[in-house]
Design a protein with these regions (language model features):
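Conserved SAM-binding loop of SAM-dependent methyltransferases across substrates and taxa
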Residues: 119-130
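Conserved class I S-adenosyl-L-methionine
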Residues: 108-116
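Conserved beta-strand signature within the Rossmann-like core of class I S-adenosyl-L-methionine
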Residues: 204-212
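A short glycine-rich, Lys/Arg-flanked "PGG" loop and its adjoining helix->strand segment in the class I
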Residues: 191-203
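A short acidic, Gly/Pro-enriched loop at the edge of an enzyme's catalytic core
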Residues: 167-177
Length: 323
C-alpha cells in the first residue's frame, strides 16, 4: 500500500480529467451476466461472499465484520509484530456497529430491517438491545453463519436471517440499517434500492447507511468501465458519490439525507489490519485450496484499497436518512 498510495494521491494529475472521461470509450464493458437484476445480483454476491467462510475468518476479526471500523484515537495501532491480535480491531468494529444502531435509534422493541447481513454481528448486537431483526442476504454461506451466531448469542428468536434480494422485502420497519451494501447494487438500481427503503420504512422511522464513496466527477468518468477488480473481486460493483446519493434520494423517495459523516482514514487503517492478517495467514489460506495466484491477487486487492483510502481517492460515509 505504501507504494500505491502516492500514485492514488496524484491520480488526477497522472490521468487528466479528459482522459479519465474517455475511459468509457476504450475500457471493457460490464458483461450482461453481471448486471444486478435479481439473477445477476445473486450470482455476483455468491462469487465473492461464498468463497469460504473460513477464508474470511483468517483475516477478519472475531466479529467477522467486513466493512470499515471506526477507530478511537486512544486505541493503539496494530503493529506488524502482532497481526493476530484482534482485540483492537474487534473493538473498533463494535464501535462502528453501535454508532450505526444509535443513528437509527435502535432500542428495545424496534422493528429493524438490515439490508446485507454480512456474518451477523450487527443483527446480534441489535437483538441484544431487544430489537426484532429481519436481515436479508444473497449469500448462503453468510446466512448459515449468521443464524448460528444468533443462536449462540441467545438471540435466535429475535433474528430472522432471510435469503432474499432487498427488492423482495415486505413489511414495515421502524429502522433500516445497511452497511456497505449499496456498492453491490449497481448504478442503474440505486433508485430501486432507496425506493425499497422508503417503501418499508414506517412513519417516524430512521435509516442509517454506511457507504464507500468517490468524488462525483470520478464517478461520472468511470461509470460503465470494467476493471480488474470487477472481473476478479467484486463483479457488478460500483461506488457512489455523496452527490449521487443525495440526488437519487431526493428524486426517488420521500426521504432526505439529514447527516453525513466521513472517516476514510479509518478505512485505510482497517484495510491495513486485514492485509497484515492475510499476510500472516497465507499458508492457512492456501491450505483451504486457494492457490498462489489467488493469494497474490487478494493481497494486491487489499493494498490497492488501502491506498485508495489513505490517499483520499476513496472515502467512506455514515448517513442518516429521514422523512
Amino acid at each position: 500500500a505504501s507504494v500505491l498510495t502516492p500514485f492514488a494521491r496524484r491520480m488526477a494529475r497522472l490521468v487528466p480529467g479528459g482522459l479519465q472521461r474517455a475511459r468509457r470509450w476504450y475500457d471493457a464493458r460490464q458483461p450482461a451476466s453481471e448486471h444486478n437484476d435479481l439473477r445477476g445480483s445473486k450470482s455476483n454476491i455468491s462469487r465473492h461472499y461464498d468463497l469460504s467462510n473460513e477464508l474470511f475468518a483468517l483475516f477478519l476479526d472475531r466479529t467477522m465484520t467486513y466493512s470499515s471500523a471506526i477507530w478511537d484515537d486512544a486505541t493503539p495501532a496494530e503493529t506488524d509484530d502482532s497481526p493476530r491480535d484482534d482485540d483492537t480491531l474487534a473493538a473498533a468494529q463494535i464501535r462502528k456497529i453501535d454508532r450505526l444502531l444509535d443513528l437509527a435509534a435502535v432500542k428495545d422493541g424496534t422493528r429493524l430491517l438490515e439490508i446485507g447481513t454480512g456474518w451477523g454481528e450487527l443483527a446480534v448486537r441489535a437483538a441484544s438491545r431487544g430489537a426484532n431483526v429481519t436481515t436479508v442476504t444473497l449469500s448462503r454461506e453468510q446466512q448459515a453463519w449468521a443464524i448460528r451466531r444468533a443462536e449462540l448469542a441467545g438471540v435466535g428468536d429475535l433474528v430472522d436471517v432471510q435469503l432474499h434480494d432487498y427488492r423482495e422485502v415486505t413489511g414495515s420497519y421502524d429502522a433500516v440499517v445497511s452497511v456497505e451494501m449499496i456498492e453491490a447494487v449497481g448504478l442503474e438500481y440505486w433508485p430501486d434500492y432507496f425506493a425499497t427503503i422508503d417503501r418499508v420504512l414506517a412513519p417516524g422511522g430512521r435509516v442509517a447507511l454506511q457507504s464507500i464513496t468517490i468524488e462525483h466527477q470520478r464517478l461520472l468518468a468511470t461509470k460503465g468501465t470494467y476493471t480488474w477488480i470487477h472481473k476478479y473481486v467484486f463483479p457488478g460493483g460500483i461506488i457512489p458519490s455523496l452527490h449521487a446519493v443525495r440526488d437519487i434520494v431526493a428524486h426517488n423517495t420521500r426521504l432526505r439525507v439529514s447527516s453525513a459523516t466521513a472517516y476514510g482514514h479509518d478505512y485505510a487503517r482497517t484495510l491495513h489490519s486485514w492485509l497484515e492478517r492475510f499476510h500472516a495467514n497465507t499458508a492457512a489460506v492456501q491450505a483451504l485450496g486457494f492457490d498462489e495466484r489467488f493469494t497474490r491477487m487478494w493481497k494486491f486487492y487489499l493494498a490497492y484499497c488501502e491506498a485508495g483510502f489513505a490517499s483520499g481517492y476513496l472515502d467512506v460515509h455514515q448517513l442518516v436518512l429521514e422523512r
